[in-house]
Amino acid sequence: MKYIKIVLIFFFAVITNVKAYSKAPVDITKLDVYEIQEAIDNGYLTYELLIQLYLDRIEAYDSNYNAIISINEEALNEAKKCDLEYEEQGRPNVLWCLPIIVKDNIDVKGMATTVGAKALADSFPNEDAMVIKKLKEKGMIILAKSNMSQYAFKAGSSVSSYGTVHNAYNLAYSSYGSSGGSAVAVALQYAPFALGTDTNSSLRAPAAANNVIGFRSTLNLIDTKGIVAYDITRDVVGPISKSVAENALILETLTGNSYDVSDSTFEGKTIAVLDQFLYGDSSIGGIATSSTYSEIVRLFEDALIKMEEAGANIIHLEDFYSYKYELAGNNTMGGWTMCHAFNDYIKGTSSKISSFYELAAASGNIYSLWNNYDKCSVNISYTKTMENKKEEYRNYVNTIFEKYAIDAIVYPNSKNKLLKTNESNSKIASYAIAPVLGLPAVSMPLGFDNLGLAYGIEFLTLKNNEQELYEIITAYENVNHHSKLPEIAPALYEVPESVDKLKEIHESGLKVNLPPVIKILTDDFNVEPLENKIADFFLNYNDYEDVDETAKSLIKEYETLKDESSVYIKKLKKIIVLIIIATIILLIFLSRRLKKAKRKN
């Protein structure tokens, strides 16, 4: 706790002394993408301001986190164009003009793809990766490229030529890897989404360690062209987000499929717990079966109770685990495929490095590539052995799903206590069922331990069953939601209560309860000038030095107008009553005169 307080003091010193950051009448760290677009509709944000607010967060905090390698210098200009198009034709879809951060092994035209190596700082791709093309078709803005474990080599950390990525919730701890920068960026609200890649656990492990959602889809469901490969037999690109609904929006864009993430329940769902992965069994031997960190067990068992109370049929698979499957899962083909894949990839870039050999020989490598270079020729015998193990494993898992009528298997993303930065541990990653079999799996926030460190729970289902997986994690999110902004990276500005109150007035419309006839009688209560003043306040929010006092003044003006109109209406009612009485008297008088006239005739 003392450490956190010291860091907080340091951060606030940074915030107050570096520059005056932009502000808005809404706190972007509390908004999902639907609320962001609504704020733009209400005039509280422009796309240009939105991008600036995210850039401010990167500037304020990232010197301590190292989550970002490069910024898209055209992001603000793209946002300005968005504002002009929005005024002219509206918004075509919910993702339009929203920012996303992508891992720096994914090609974005105009930005270097370094894979975490300064040796590739001049490697500019000739075209966007296929996934980037699809995001841009939706109108999204690539905001930045995220740091990663160099060449996607390590799961225990994200260390590259550009520094070590630190955990979003505690700088002394690891972000995990290799997509650590992407996970930390979303946790810190640098952007609503990020893309990462997953070979063995590279997307899901960092997501778990940073309290965000990391989705690995079925192998080959998403086109990976334009992504620097590690192991082409299991590499997958996927979305990282704070919520399930936001996650599905990105996966829909990348796959072309539609996923229903409306309210879902656990009713009728059978969720199988892999007890061996949860509790471990020392009789089997090996690090992979060591005892699980007690706080993970506590959080996991609490989550199971919540799922069961919500209607899930929880079953326990005590006999699922076999250590040979873990061995098969963690031996990737990266050593053989990486070399050939890079030699093909680099041809489509401006890099001075033209081969894997030259990359291995380059200075500044955090991790040696020579072992991979030595394996550049594929070992056919080893490949066949691995494929046979995978097929055996695949048949086994399919049999288990069918035997117990399972909808999803669930287990902790990791058994171990979160590692400190640069702490060595060879077995921290997610279990390799999903990558070795090409199955979809997602890491969801499990909760925080007694030190405030985040952990994840992983759900896995069968091939091409992303829809059911989204249904299950939607139900999970409803009963075990843990999203929160790291205390050491708070919002850069506060939204005063007066501004929130003024927004309520603005959104409900200025109502002074005047009948339409009043407009004929007087202009004293015309609300249009005040409406314009309020709209100008929100439009030019950053130009107002004291937004709290200005908002209070506008609220007072509105309330005064309401009070005066109420008094006017009361007086008017009295006048109307008198007019009615006078009219009745006149009618009675005229009626009597008419009767007298008739009698005379």
Map each language-model feature to its residues.
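Short helix-loop capping/hinge segments that flank enzyme active sites or metal/cofactor-binding pockets
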Residues: 24, 95-118, 272-283, 333-398, ...
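Structural helix-boundary/capping segments
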Residues: 60, 137, 187-279, 301, ...
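Cytoplasmic C-terminal tails of single-pass
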Residues: 596-601
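Sec-dependent signal peptide recognition
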Residues: 2-9
